Curated annotation (Swiss-Prot):
<dbReference type="InterPro" id="IPR036157">
    <property type="entry name" value="dUTPase-like_sf"/>
</dbReference>
<dbReference type="GO" id="GO:0046081">
    <property type="term" value="P:dUTP catabolic process"/>
</dbReference>
<protein>
    <recommendedName>
        <fullName>Deoxyuridine 5'-triphosphate nucleotidohydrolase</fullName>
        <ecNumber>3.6.1.23</ecNumber>
    </recommendedName>
</protein>
<feature type="binding site">
    <location>
        <position position="98"/>
    </location>
    <ligand>
        <name>substrate</name>
    </ligand>
</feature>
<comment type="similarity">
    <text>Belongs to the dUTPase family.</text>
</comment>
<dbReference type="InterPro" id="IPR008181">
    <property type="entry name" value="dUTPase"/>
</dbReference>
<keyword id="KW-0460">Magnesium</keyword>
<comment type="pathway">
    <text>Pyrimidine metabolism; dUMP biosynthesis; dUMP from dCTP (dUTP route): step 2/2.</text>
</comment>
<comment type="function">
    <text>This enzyme is involved in nucleotide metabolism: it produces dUMP, the immediate precursor of thymidine nucleotides and it decreases the intracellular concentration of dUTP so that uracil cannot be incorporated into DNA.</text>
</comment>
<keyword id="KW-0378">Hydrolase</keyword>
<dbReference type="GO" id="GO:0006226">
    <property type="term" value="P:dUMP biosynthetic process"/>
</dbReference>
<dbReference type="GO" id="GO:0000287">
    <property type="term" value="F:magnesium ion binding"/>
</dbReference>
<dbReference type="InterPro" id="IPR029054">
    <property type="entry name" value="dUTPase-like"/>
</dbReference>
<dbReference type="InterPro" id="IPR033704">
    <property type="entry name" value="dUTPase_trimeric"/>
</dbReference>
<dbReference type="Pfam" id="PF00692">
    <property type="entry name" value="dUTPase"/>
</dbReference>
<comment type="subunit">
    <text>Homotrimer.</text>
</comment>
<feature type="binding site">
    <location>
        <position position="84"/>
    </location>
    <ligand>
        <name>substrate</name>
    </ligand>
</feature>
Length: 152
């Protein structure tokens, strides 16, 4: 299923020097987001930075949200992940998409202008209304927390 999402180009290089986000294959879940930088940015181990994408989106449908996720190769090979682990884009947000990048690796890492540094997926959202109760109906698990269901 393809859903139309409004996108605004904030930097004129996007769509020319830096390709618009696209799905790499027909089965891809995520769109690659690129670093819309003037110059390369070097991240030392432990450093974080906010990287602009040059794009703004307006989802406009409260039953959808976008999530920004790390690219698996950058995380596994270089220790480059998102500083907030997952970026959540609400349906009514209209500002620039910014990517919080964290170097959790052991070596310096350089982000090049136009480099693919994150991916964005669209996910369904259910807004819940809380129903206040005194007690819950009993379940097998009950209040068992972390590790309660075992390892095997």
């Amino acid at each position: 299923m393809m859903k139309k999402i409004d996108v605004k180009i904030l930097d004129p290089r996007v769509g020319k020097e830096f390709p618009l986000p696209t799905y790499a294959t027909s089965g891809s879940a995520g769109l690659d987001l690129r670093a819309c930088l003037d110059d390369a940015v070097e991240l030392a181990p432990g450093d974080t930075t906010l990287v602009p994408t040059g794009l703004a989106i307006h989802i406009a449908d409260p039953s959808l949200a976008a999530m920004m996720l790390p690219r698996s190769g950058l995380g596994h090979k270089h220790g480059i992940v998102l500083g907030n682990l997952v970026g959540l884009i609400d349906s009514d947000y209209q500002g620039q998409l910014m990517i919080s990048v964290w170097n959790r690796g052991q070596d310096n890492f350089t982000i090049q202008p136009g480099e693919r540094i994150a991916q964005m997926i669209f996910v369904p959202v259910v807004q819940a209304e809380f129903n206040l109760v005194e007690d819950f109906d009993a379940t097998d698990r009950g209040e068992g927390g972390f590790g309660h269901s075992g390892r095997q």
